[in-house]
Structures are given as structure tokens and as C-alpha cells.
């Protein structure tokens, strides 16, 4: 009888990649539902387009690399990449944008590096940044939440807008972005930044309809809270660890609080930073990507804190209103260095 000894490591995680990805997709349901409620059917249509494109692009590359298509598509990683990109772009963005962004994310940012587990950068955020740099106007053309929108497109008009750029009555995106005050709307962070540049005071800005009676923007605070619910679910299921989201949110809140205390007339409040834009989505669903994040506990704390500082700096002093995507990619660059200096000590070996 021959006994074969498997090579190390001997510890084994019973959770398969497909189950982990499926849990993340399930955790995303509250956030997707909230975005659909406040911004319309476009969110769901973008997700469908992204999912189809992601699976198609993944299948093509796998076939070219002569790898098993069925087994790789069943790990749901391509679907998750498509979903994260789809919820990050405006719901009425032209159909070809989500197809282009998702295709770039899967083919260039993921498969070109060798596939799942080999990519150094978050594929969804690579796709997002490519679209943002290439098509800045379309990528910042968010609809106002239905509560302050003058016109809300129905399901068929949403489809027409995505595929033709016009509603049945001939309306376009410019018309749909008009709020109840008759002014074209933007996201809370975008509105804050552009209004400051226009010479408005923070006190004046906070009187705008998009901030009326809420902590961080009509609709957006509930969207962020919905993503937070999904993040708590992931923590409860032990799909992600607490280090990255907690260090990211605490650091972002600390930077925002200090900045707001020193310069309340030019910098956004902590609640606006925490409950606007892609804060909670980034904290629990993007930064926690096990492939592109730090792998040690101390490293995760540093990684999350670095991303928090970068988000605050970009939002406060950069040219883009949000900054989560850029912060994630910049933090991804530092992961090898962070992991090198936070390696746990190996006992029984002298320091070389």
C-alpha cells in the first residue's frame, strides 16, 4: 500500500469560491433594491447587460485559453464583477457603455493577468475608471431620486433611453435630470463640489432640495444604508473580515470630521462622506475583494485606512466628486508592500 502525503498547506477552507461569490451576490440585493427604488428600472437593466457581457467575455477568453468554460462560469465571479460595475454607473447610461466597461474589466483587468486570483487590481473598478476617464459627461449624468425628480421614466421609457437616448415622447436625459426646483440635478457629492466652485457657501448648498431634511442627500443615504445591511450580512456569514471596512469607515469619518471642524465653510461634513456616493458599497463589497486586498490582519487595517484617506483627499481636493474607485486602485498598488512589511513572524527562524 502506498501512502501519499499532500503538500502544505494542510488547512482547508470548505467554502468554495462559487459559494462565497453567491453570498456576495445575495448580500448585494438590498443595495440593488434601494437603487432601483430611488433611481428606477435602469439599475436592473444595466445589471442584466453587464451580466450577459461578463459571461460572454469570460467564455470567449476561456475558450481561447483552452480552459473549461462551464466550471469557470459557475464560480459567479464574472457575474459579481458585472454587478459591481453596473450599480456604479448612472442607470440611464447608454447600453454600449456598460458593455464596453464590463468587457474591459473581464478581458483586460481580469483574464489578461491569468484569471480569477491573479489580477492585481479590482476588475470592476478598472472598468469604471476607464469609462469615467473616457466618457466623463455620461458617467456623471445621474438622475435625481424619484422624490425630487420632475419627471420619472417608466420601464419602457427607461429601455428606450438606454438603447436610443430618447423617451417615447421625445424627451432626453437633459429633461429627465431636471428636479422639482427646475434645475438639473447631480449626486450630493457632485452638487457639493460644483456649487463650492461656483462660489456658493456650505450653508447655501445644504438648502438645496437634494439635501432637504436628510443627513446626506435624498435617496443616497438610504442606498448607502442598504449596502451597509448587505455588508453586515457578509460579516455575519464570515464571508469578509471586519478589518478593512471598519478601518476604511473610521479613517474616512476621522478625516472628514477633522477637515469639517477646521474648515466647515469649504469641506463636507462626516455624514455626507459616510452616507453619499459609493462609500458603503466600497467598504463592504469592493475593498474586501480577497484577490486584490491585503492578506494579513494588520495589512488589512492599513489597506482600509489608506483607502479612507485617499477617498477623503480626492473628494475634498481632487477633480472627481467621489473617488472610491481611484482610492481602491491606488490602494491595490500598495498591497505587495503592505503584505511584505506585515508578514507574521515565523518562530524558530532567525531574522535574516
Curated annotation (Swiss-Prot):
One Pfam entry name:
NQR2_RnfD_RnfE
The residues that cross the membrane are 20-40, 44-64, 78-109, 123-143, 214-234, 242-262, 267-287, 301-321, 322-342
Q: Which GO terms describe its biological process?
A: electron transport chain; transmembrane transport
Could you tell me the EC number(s) of this protein? 7.-.-.-
Question: Where's it found, cell-wise?
Answer: Cell inner membrane
Keywords, alphabetical? Cell inner membrane, Cell membrane, Electron transport, Flavoprotein, FMN, Membrane, Phosphoprotein, Translocase, Transmembrane, Transmembrane helix, Transport
- Keyword set includes Transmembrane: yes
Positions where FMN phosphoryl threonine occurs in the chain:
187
GO cellular component, as recorded:
plasma membrane
Major site of localization recorded for this protein: membrane
User: What is the protein's name according to its record?
Assistant: Ion-translocating oxidoreductase complex subunit D
**From which source organism is this entry?**
Salmonella arizonae (strain ATCC BAA-731 / CDC346-86 / RSK2980)
Amino acid at each position: 500500500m502506498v501512502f501519499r502525503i499532500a503538500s502544505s498547506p494542510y488547512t482547508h477552507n470548505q467554502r468554495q469560491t462559487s459559494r462565497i461569490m453567491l453570498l456576495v451576490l445575495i448580500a448585494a440585493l438590498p443595495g440593488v433594491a434601494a437603487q432601483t427604488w430611488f433611481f428606477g428600472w435602469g439599475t436592473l437593466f444595466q445589471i442584466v447587460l453587464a451580466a450577459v457581457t461578463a459571461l460572454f467575455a469570460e467564455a470567449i477568453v476561456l475558450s481561447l485559453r483552452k480552459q473549461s468554460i462551464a466550471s469557470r462560469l459557475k464560480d459567479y465571479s464574472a457575474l459579481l464583477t458585472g454587478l459591481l460595475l453596473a450599480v456604479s454607473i448612472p442607470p440611464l447610461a447608454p447600453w454600449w457603455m456598460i458593455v464596453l466597461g464590463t468587457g474591459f474589466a473581464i478581458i483586460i483587468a481580469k483574464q489578461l493577468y491569468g484569471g480569477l486570483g491573479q489580477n492585481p487590481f479590482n476588475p470592476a473598478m478598472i472598468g469604471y475608471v476607464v469609462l469615467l476617464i473616457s466618457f466623463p459627461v455620461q458617467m456623471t449624468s445621474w438622475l435625481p431620486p424619484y422624490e425630487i425628480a420632475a419627471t420619472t421614466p417608466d420601464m419602457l421609457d427607461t429601455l428606450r433611453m438606454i438603447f436610443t437616448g430618447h423617451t417615447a415622447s421625445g424627451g432626453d436625459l437633459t429633461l429627465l435630470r431636471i428636479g422639482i426646483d427646475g434645475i438639473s440635478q447631480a449626486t450630493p457629492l457632485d452638487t457639493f463640489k460644483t456649487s463650492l466652485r461656483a462660489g456658493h457657501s456650505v450653508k447655501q448648498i445644504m438648502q438645496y432640495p437634494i439635501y432637504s431634511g436628510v443627513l446626506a442627500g435624498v435617496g443616497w443615504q438610504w442606498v448607502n444604508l442598504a449596502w451597509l445591511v448587505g455588508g453586515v450580512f457578509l460579516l455575519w456569514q464570515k464571508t469578509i473580515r471586519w478589518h478593512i471596512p471598519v478601518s476604511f469607515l473610521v479613517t474616512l469619518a476621522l478625516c472628514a470630521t477633522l477637515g469639517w471642524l477646521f474648515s466647515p465653510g469649504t469641506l463636507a461634513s462626516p455624514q455626507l462622506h459616510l452616507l453619499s456616493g459609493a462609500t458603503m458599497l466600497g467598504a463592504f463589497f469592493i475593498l474586501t475583494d480577497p484577490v486584490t486586498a491585503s492578506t494579513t490582519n494588520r495589512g488589512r487595517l492599513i489597506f482600509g485606512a489608506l483607502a479612507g484617506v485617499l477617498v477623503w483627499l480626492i473628494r475634498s481636493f481632487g477633480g472627481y466628486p467621489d473617488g472610491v474607485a481611484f482610492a481602491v486602485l491606488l490602494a491595490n498598488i500598495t498591497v505587495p508592500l503592505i503584505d511584505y512589511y506585515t508578514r507574521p513572524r515565523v518562530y524558530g527562524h532567525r531574522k535574516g
